[in-house]
Amino acid sequence: MYSTVFYTSVHPSTSAFSRKQLPLLISKDFPTELYHSLPCSRSLENGQIKKVKGVVKATIAEAPATIPPTDLKKVPQKKLKVLVAGGGIGGLVFALAAKKRGFDVLVFERDLSAIRGEGQYRGPIQIQSNALAALEAIDMDVAEDIMNAGCITGQRINGLVDGVSGNWYCKFDTFTPAVERGLPVTRVISRMTLQQNLARAVGEDIIMNESNVVNFEDDGEKVTVTLEDGQQYTGDLLVGADGIRSKVRTNLFGPSDVTYSGYTCYTGIADFVPADIETVGYRVFLGHKQYFVSSDVGGGKMQWYAFHNEPAGGVDDPNGKKARLLKIFEGWCDNVIDLLVATDEDAILRRDIYDRPPTFSWGKGRVTLLGDSVHAMQPNLGQGGCMAIEDSYQLALELDKALSRSAESGTPVDIISSLRSYESSRKLRVGVIHGLARMAAIMASTYKAYLGVGLGPLSFLTKFRIPHPGRVGGRFFIDLGMPLMLSWVLGGNGEKLEGRIQHCRLSEKANDQLRNWFEDDDALERATDAEWLLLPAGNSNAALETLVLSRDENMPCNIGSVSHANIPGKSVVIPLPQVSEMHARISYKGGAFFVTDLRSEHGTWITDNEGRRYRASPNFPTRFHPSDIIEFGSDKKAAFRVKVMKFPPKTAAKEERQAVGAA
């Protein structure tokens, strides 16, 4: 069995971007003799993976940035002493990159428990293809451990949906930009696990706990940092990786305010498995001045973020976060409400979202900044941590090049020029992605599904379900620009990763239907492997029971006011006046459910997920979908809500058996 497919093309073919950027599919059953026709064309057996890693390391070791042994006699060489303020993701990744290149590194971290337990506070983090590739270029073994611990989301459907209806607005293809460039596929990983792996790779002897950098002095030859307890340490350069409220930044450029995004964010992790877990990785649910993000994080858990437009500094009532969220998102689709309901109150956290405006000044002298300390961005693209990882690789590379030039020329290491070179190489890319993250928030805050939303006295127009012009026009531009944007964000830094061999992993392969799912919403729904239920939703005092529908095409569900045990299928009795003796039949075919009205007196009615109510045609199968309301009769007493669940509650199965007992 092939475990790794290597990308041998130096210049991958240019993608033909269409309305949907479609993935290149690699199936486990794909004939091995045809692999030469794919971008990723060479393969190795499992036992050769270690050799491959050795090749990557050897390539890095032979790069021009390495000091030739003969040059050591020409110029006395000593390790550069690199001081790093901050032991978050950016600080640790840079420390690892610098250590791998032979530098003497010391990381100052205010609270080592933040490294061990930050994941408990902020939850999992998405590491996209561009950052995973940078990690591979830094240390293949560490990157492999991190990827193995993550949950792959990039080979499933991801994108934007309408928050109320749950209908797809735009799908993102993060798979194609990765495999076409030989990059790892996007993953989500526990922040705590990520930082533990990084801290272990860096080494506890390099990370100083309870060491908060409060000041520094750059005399032109050395940099001396001062800790909160008065201790001082001297090095050849200082890297400020101490977050959005960086003390290093403040000492460099003076105090400056962070920028409030206009949104507060609630976040939580729920023990919950959505019905479409096999086909959908993450979704952004759009609404007017509020939006909701959900992502599979593996292990039967889902992470979510709820953003709401309001002033900063708000405080919730004790144990009131969940109740407030359910009120804010009242009327939204099941995918949102189910996650909120499944989350414990004490697992919900709240924080206001801030960023910093882009700046042209990243450092001075022997001091530079990295990650959030210089370009803190809103989380809407999931690129904040990814940019810090890219920064880390580039900074270590520039320092290594400076050391190599020093060895070749016999001159002192030009640290200052190498820091400015790092900053120049990163400013444009980071600035563009920072702007895109802000634009994503603006789009979310201005999204309106229907004409009349947010218009106060004219809000009655929403009942006519007239699509808002902004939604229609916005979709056109998103469909046009999203493939280009994703291609550049995910693959635009790959050429700078010196020594990294482009490759794909068969373990990251996509379902062979992924191409179809991007184009066909109906095919995506039919692929859902879950149980379909009808939950009582009527205004009757009758004890209606939950119905579990069968996906056996030979086992229809016959609904009437009396039992029909002599008819094939299950008989469901609803003893209400407007339910006819033989009212309707529910059947399953080709991955979808249909209801057929059997010429009942008062009809069978369906209200879809956008609020449109219509009568099913007699003796004609009518398709229904998740979240629809089905009414047997016109008085809304025998009404049921269509619910699709991965694991239906045990009570539902019990009630279903009672409902069909005699049948």
Swiss-Prot record:
UniProt KW Signal keyword: no
CDD domains (UniProt xref): FHA_ZEP-like
UniProt-listed PROSITE patterns: FHA_DOMAIN (PS50006)
Cellular compartments per GO CC: chloroplast membrane; chloroplast thylakoid membrane
Leading EC class: oxidoreductase
Swiss-Prot/TrEMBL GO biological process terms: abscisic acid biosynthetic process
Residue range covered by the transit peptide: 1-50
Topology class, membrane: Peripheral membrane protein
Pathway: Plant hormone biosynthesis; abscisate biosynthesis
Residues noted as binding FAD in the record, renumbered to the chain: 81-109, 359-372
Inducing or repressing factors: By drought stress; in roots.
Tissue: Higher expression in leaves than in roots.
InterPro entries (UniProt xref): FAD-bd (IPR002938), FAD/NAD-bd_sf (IPR036188), FHA_dom (IPR000253), SMAD_FHA_dom_sf (IPR008984), Zeaxanthin_epoxidase (IPR017079)
Catalysed reaction equations from the record: all-trans-zeaxanthin + 4 reduced [2Fe-2S]-[ferredoxin] + 2 O2 + 4 H(+) = all-trans-violaxanthin + 4 oxidized [2Fe-2S]-[ferredoxin] + 2 H2O
Pfam families: FAD_binding_3, FHA
EC number per UniProt: 1.14.15.21
Co-factor(s): FAD
Keyword field: Abscisic acid biosynthesis, Chloroplast, FAD, Flavoprotein, Membrane, Oxidoreductase, Plastid, Stress response, Thylakoid, Transit peptide
Protein location: Plastid, Chloroplast membrane; Plastid, Chloroplast thylakoid membrane
MF terms in GO: FAD binding; zeaxanthin epoxidase activity
Function description: Converts zeaxanthin into antheraxanthin and subsequently violaxanthin. Involved in the epoxidation of zeaxanthin. Plays an important role in resistance to stresses, seed development and dormancy.
Protein name: Zeaxanthin epoxidase, chloroplastic
Gene that this polypeptide is encoded by: ABA2
